Amino acid sequence: MKYLIEVIGETFLSISDPIDHRHWFLSKEQHAYEFIFMNLFYLVVIFIGINLNKKREYENQRKPKPIPEKDYPSLLNKIVAIILAINVFLNLIYKCLRGWRVVFFMLQPCHIVSTIYCYCLLTNNYQFGRKVFKISIYYILVTIAALVAPDLADLTLPFECYNFFIQHYALLIAPFLLQAYRYNIEFELPYALISQGLFGISHFFVFEIFCFISGTNINYMLFPPPLGEFSYLTQESYRVGIAFILFILALGIGRLVILIGSKIRSTFLLKNKSK
């Protein structure tokens, strides 16, 4: 294990291109340990989720097939999708204006989830869109975190701050619209686990590697966000600690969004359609 840690640490050192003095806030050994164990943890979570889902699907084969949920076409869905698409495009322009390194920030969850929600809001492939939504609904926690503690220090270009808030409020609204007007899913633990497993691997594998290559702090994988009075969170364990906190919170908040969206659907849409 010690040799493996050394090899991974040296690999990170060889591909890294620092542009900030905090680039090595965590040691190469710390990065290597977390790269191995956190990715293993999230792979196990995905494996459990997939197997639970297979078991659930097998059990459902024996039951009568439910009547498919009705999709209520909504102009609001299209408006929110267009807003998200425009925001992603504007963010890409902003990043390109700052140089090739900054373009890697397009991997940030807000931009990826914006693209996913655009697809879910507009796709004609209802069944696949439903599965994608079952996974992506739990990422609303990232949106909430960004709105509660917005990091606007680097947003200096015209309209960039406004664009940030417009995008994130659209991201906040989108899951409720998708639940109320389109998919009306239920909380399913297998999909919740797959969701969090993918989220974790995107950080501790994909973001980790691209952070070293570009030198940019994608979703704070190199060094912590400005935490103010909570400076004790900036110790070496901040990534692991926040990862597990988000893991638990995402399941609870995702479930709450499902319940609220279903309530909106049953209270307003179904009653209005029955009149």
Curated annotation (Swiss-Prot):
It is found in: Membrane. The keyword Membrane applies. It comes from the Eukaryota. GO terms for biological process: positive regulation of ferroptosis. Keywords: Membrane, Transmembrane, Transmembrane helix. The keyword Lipid biosynthesis does not apply. The chain crosses the membrane at residues 32-52, 74-94, 102-122, 135-155, 157-177, 193-213, 240-260. GO terms for cellular component: membrane. PANTHER family: TRANSMEMBRANE PROTEIN 164. Belongs to the TMEM164 family. This is Transmembrane protein 164 homolog. The lineage of its organism: Eukaryota, Amoebozoa, Evosea, Eumycetozoa, Dictyostelia.
